[in-house]
Every structure is written in structure tokens, then in C-alpha cells.
Amino acid sequence: MAAGAPAGRRHPDRDWLASVQAALAWWADAEPDWPTSSVLGSGAVAAAEAAFSERHGGRPALLLPSATYALRVALQAAGVTAGDQVICGAIDWPAGYAAIVSLGAVPVPVAADPLTLTLDPAAAAAARTRETRAVLACHLHGVCADVPALRRLLPGVPVIEDAAQAFGSRLDGRLAGTMGDAAVLSLGPGKQIDAGEGGVLLCRGRARYQRAVAIACHPLRLLLAGQPPPAPAALSVRPHPVAAVLALHRLAGWSAAAERSGHEETARRLAGHTSLRLLGDTRRHQSSQPHVPVLLPDGHPALPPPGLSWLPSAAGVLPGLAAPERRRAARLLARVRLAASTGR
């Protein structure tokens, strides 16, 4: 017992510790070919990467310490360097903005689709310049951005999916993380696959994956893979090996179909409240999130409908917006709430 802790007090991390212990015991009964090493990318790390790859059409997967860092690696692998422009949504989670500016690149925020709050493909195409090197499309609140339209309207520009909030979501039947040139998943707290912390980078094709490995991994992993040594500036920031075990254990018992079914049921209940407008088009968007994002009209009563609970929106406004756009986006975000069935 920690010094000073009251006798008989329930440990605040009891449930979390139990889940970690269960995952480690589960892995102890496994039969991996190699010991687990984040340096070599072996054992549980390799198994986790293979599991995420299998769930995403065989796209090569790379386990990384956070989704934000994975976004940075994805941008680097796309060739983004200082001074380049990256098109992104005016309404976005700030980590995407941070990944762009960490490389010295310039975020170019464009208008959101009012039906989804995700990046509007036509606005993105209009913002393209000779300095545009990539598009970062965030699937906000599990609602997929229209990545196929982005690829069609911006030929030759790599499209990176920020699927941190959309593991298991679909657009027109296509799985989030399989539509762009690269995609990032989050294993952070509160995500569908919660490993405590971590991110997964999915790549279209081996060449892009090998560039990501050279950017992010230890020289020994490159040597074993038959790749040349990394540049001297490579950071070799690796995930904790226990995170790989936690992700594998959670993934083994997780069903995207069941999560999407639960989301659809919550959306069906919400659809009966005519004062709410659900984000996304249920004919196109199938979300795996336990919550359903809605827009509230001006003057909507503070109390939620019976049987529903409300959570604040996680969306943020990029600092790069001009002041009038920032004010308009802030007013819009003030009306965004996440509604979820009580007890889910």
C-alpha cells in the first residue's frame, strides 16, 4: 500500500491494473517466435503490427509510441519538409496541426463539410498550390472524411487519414484506414483499442512503409529488414513493449461489427428528436464509436433528452485560422455535443 493511503481504500487504478495483469497473463500463454523487443520490432510488437495489418486489408502496419508521432512520421514518409503546405480541416483535433508544424511545414486549414464537420473535398481542391505536399483528413468523432473524393480531386497529393477516433468506422463500406495513402490509429486512453498509449501507422504499399521504418525505427530493425541504416537525424522513438501486449489483448476480444451495431441503435434513438441533427449520412457513414455526434440548434435546452447523456465535443479550432473564421468555427463548435446511450 502506498504511504499515507487510507486503510481499506479501493485503489483508483484497480480496474486498469487488473486489465494489464490479464493481458500479461494472456501473453504469457502465447507462443511467439521471438522475444518481445521494441528495438527489433519482434515478439508482441510484430504480432500487434500483423494483427492491425490483417484487419486493414494487409496494409503494412507500424506500431509507434503515440498517434501524434505516427502522424508526424506519416507526413515525413509523404515527403513533407519545412516550408511545404499541408491541407487540413478548419475544425480538427490539435494534434494534426502539431504534427504539421513540428516539421516546419505550413497548415492550410480549409472549410468543413457542414454535414460531417470533416474536411470538405471541394474546398481542399481549391486550396491546392505548387507548395501542397499532403492532405491530412481527420475522421472526427468516428465520421469518416470523404477520402475517395479527396484522392480524386487532388491527384498526386498524398492523403493521410487521421483515424484516431475512427477505428472500425466505414464510409460506403470501405474501412477507415484503408482509403488513403497512409492512416493513423490511436491506442490512447478512451479509444476503442486502449493500450494506455500508442499509435499505429498503416501504409499503402511497401515503399511508403519502408520509408516510415527508416524514419521511426531503431537501426537494428532496419538491418534485420535488409534496409540501409537511417539518416543521422532519425529519432528512433519506439513504443513500450507492454503497450503491444495490451493492444493485442484488447484487439482479440473486440468486434467492429458489434460496435457499429451499437452506434446505429444509439443513432436510431436520437433520430427521433427533431431538434437534433446527426453528423454524417447514415447511408454512407457507419461509425464504430460508442457515441453519436450531433449538432444542437441555437437556444437548445441544456437538459438532454430522457435516457441520454451528453459529453463535450473533442474537436478544436486550428490556431492558423483567420479571426473571423475562428469566431464562426468557435460558434459552431459551441453547438457540438457527443450524445451516448446511458450505460454504454
For the regions a protein language model found, what residue spans apply to each?
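PLP-dependent aminotransferase class I/II
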Residues: 43-51, 55-59, 122, 134-138, ...
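Conserved PLP-anchoring active-site segment centered on the Schiff-base-forming lysine
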Residues: 74-128
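Conserved PLP-binding active-site segment in aminotransferase class I/II-type PLP enzymes
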Residues: 1-77, 81, 250, 327-344
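Structural detector of well-ordered beta-strand residues that form the stable sheet scaffold
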Residues: 87, 108, 158-160, 184, ...
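A structural micro-motif
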Residues: 59, 84, 105, 157-158, ...
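Alpha-helical structural signal in soluble globular domains
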Residues: 51, 99-103, 127, 146-156, ...
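Active-site phosphate-binding strand-loop segment of PLP-dependent enzymes
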Residues: 115-195, 200-202, 206-207
